[in-house]
């Protein structure tokens, strides 16, 4: 298996520190709002990588944190007239709802930064003691010049960074590129007691501390969105390696951005979508397959038209699964014949090809293509004359290859019922808003698929015709 390591800018053989075990840390959300589709891609990508590592037999300890104290949290809490803790509690709950709906497996642990204050203060104290950090008026800064390999992850040159950092620089810092690892308390801000007075941690120290305390001095994989490479991950490396004198993470993985209609997603451009908004209209399988339809290191373009295309492709996959499920009930032949044994062995080549693609830096786009090829083959060669064993083998193989991607696991009957109920809710909403055109379109679209809606005093009922 090969992975692209941002630290070395090349694909490397994946060799974890302990054979058969993987320690993986992914930077999670700042819990002040619902997560958007850009965040969703990061979460889906690394959930898939974790699933695939487990599929290949690794035991994965997967940590994804919650940043529950930082400037954004404080600003939002003040705007809403609530506390930072209450805001964090609320949006952690909302995160779990959306992540569960997106079929993202729960992490081994989701630590909150505020649960690690004692450990963070110890971390900061150790850096001061070792000469890598200094305190001024209750603020503590990390001295980037003291860490000789600063910039090694992002390829940034410290001298060039210093030239670019001289605008609005804090004059108290010894160097413009020094960054805060402990911040003194400001009015109306939550704070904790420390040897430097009341204050709170800087963002970068939080992840370093949680990774150290939950996974140890050196971890196998550290991952996150590409926007975190600098300065967040660069600063994590500096702090962690300055403290321990050991390599912080062996492999660094970064997922690329999501653009919306070929533009960067932003609220000002009115092209900002939360995952929850999309999941109200599309099944999780659709959003996951869309997110995985490009290589994780390549930017993808998001649009409703592209989601519709993904849904149509996914429907074809599920139609084939549905046909196989029906066939399993209908076929009479039992026991694999000689030619079926041979054909079953031929189907194994798809599994081998799938593993080959995923072993090459988790190439989900090509892996999905392999699943389509498998289904085309099965559609052509498995019929009512096939044996139950062969039909079941093909069905199980399709689901097996879909599993690491988090797709194709639903019973088609359950999936259909779920979609119909979702469309009924959408139609009810349209009627409430007097959008009769949309309400009629949903009804007519369902009728074309053989689903008739009946409006009754007890609510909307549906039946297949």
UniProtKB/Swiss-Prot annotation:
Reaction equations catalysed: tRNA(Cys) + L-cysteine + ATP = L-cysteinyl-tRNA(Cys) + AMP + diphosphate
Enzyme class, first EC level, given as a word: ligase
UniProt KW S-adenosyl-L-methionine keyword: no
CDD domains in UniProt: CysRS_core
Cofactor: binding details: Binds 1 zinc ion per subunit.
The UniProt record lists the keyword Metal-binding: yes
Residue ranges that the Swiss-Prot or TrEMBL entry lists as coiled coil: none
Co-factor(s): Zn(2+)
Localisation: Cytoplasm
Matching InterPro entries: Cys-tRNA-ligase (IPR015803), Cys-tRNA-synt_Ia_DALR (IPR015273), Cys-tRNA/MSH_ligase (IPR024909), CysS_C (IPR056411), Rossmann-like_a/b/a_fold (IPR014729), tRNA-synt_1_cat_dom (IPR032678), tRNAsynth_Ia_anticodon-bd (IPR009080)
Motif ('HIGH' region): 29-39
Family classification: Belongs to the class-I aminoacyl-tRNA synthetase family.
Name of this protein: Cysteine--tRNA ligase
Native source organism of the sequence: Clostridium botulinum (strain 657 / Type Ba4)
Taxonomic lineage of the native organism: Bacteria, Bacillati, Bacillota, Clostridia, Eubacteriales
């Amino acid at each position: 298996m090969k992975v692209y390591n941002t630290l070395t800018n090349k694909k490397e053989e994946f060799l974890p520190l302990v054979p058969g075990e993987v320690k993986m840390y992914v930077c999670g959300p700042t819990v002040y709002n619902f997560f958007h589709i850009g965040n969703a891609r990061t979460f889906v990508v690394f959930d898939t990588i974790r699933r695939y590592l487990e599929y290949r037999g690794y035991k994965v300890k997967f940590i994804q944190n919650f940043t529950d104290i930082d400037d954004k949290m404080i600003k939002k809490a003040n705007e809403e007239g609530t506390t930072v803790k209450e805001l964090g509690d609320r949006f952690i709950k909302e995160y779990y709802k959306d992540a569960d709906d997106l079929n993202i497996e729960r992490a081994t642990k989701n630590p909150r930064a505020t649960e690690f204050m004692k450990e963070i203060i110890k971390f900061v104290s150790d850096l001061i003691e070792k000469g890598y950090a200094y305190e001024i008026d209750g603020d503590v800064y990390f001295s980037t010049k003291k860490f000789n390999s600063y910039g090694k992850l992002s390829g940034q040159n410290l001298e060039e960074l210093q030239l670019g950092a001289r605008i609005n620089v804090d004059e108290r810092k010894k160097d413009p590129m020094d960054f805060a690892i402990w911040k003194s308390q400001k009015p109306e801000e939550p704070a904790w007691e420390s040897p430097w007075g009341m204050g709170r941690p800087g963002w970068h120290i939080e992840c370093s501390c949680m990774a150290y305390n939950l996974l140890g001095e050196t971890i196998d994989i550290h991952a996150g969105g590409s926007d975190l490479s600098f300065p967040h991950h660069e600063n994590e490396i500096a702090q962690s390696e300055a403290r321990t004198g050991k390599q912080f993470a062996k492999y660094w993985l970064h997922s690329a951005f999501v653009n919306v209609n070929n533009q960067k997603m932003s609220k000002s451009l009115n092209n900002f979508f939360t995952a929850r908004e999309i999941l109200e209209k599309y099944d999780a399988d659709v959003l996951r397959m869309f997110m995985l339809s490009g290589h994780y290191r390549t930017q993808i373009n998001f649009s409703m038209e592209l989601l519709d295309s993904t849904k149509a492709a996914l429907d074809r996959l599920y139609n084939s699964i549905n046909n196989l499920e029906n066939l399993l009930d209908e076929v009479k032949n039992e026991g694999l014949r000689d030619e079926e044994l041979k054909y079953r062995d031929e189907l194994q080549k798809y599994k081998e090809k799938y593993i080959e693609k995923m072993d090459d830096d988790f190439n989900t786009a090509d892996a999905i293509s392999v699943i389509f090829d498998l289904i085309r083959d099965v559609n052509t060669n498995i019929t009512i004359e096939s044996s139950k064993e062969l039909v079941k083998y093909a069905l199980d193989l399709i689901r097996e290859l879909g599993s690491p991607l988090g797709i194709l696991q639903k019973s088609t009957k359950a999936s259909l019922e779920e979609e119909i109920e979702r469309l009924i809710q959408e139609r009810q909403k349209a009627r409430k808003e007097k959008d009769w055109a949309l309400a009629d379109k949903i009804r007519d679209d369902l009728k074309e698929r053989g689903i008739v809606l009946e409006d009754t005093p007890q609510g909307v009922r549906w039946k297949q015709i």
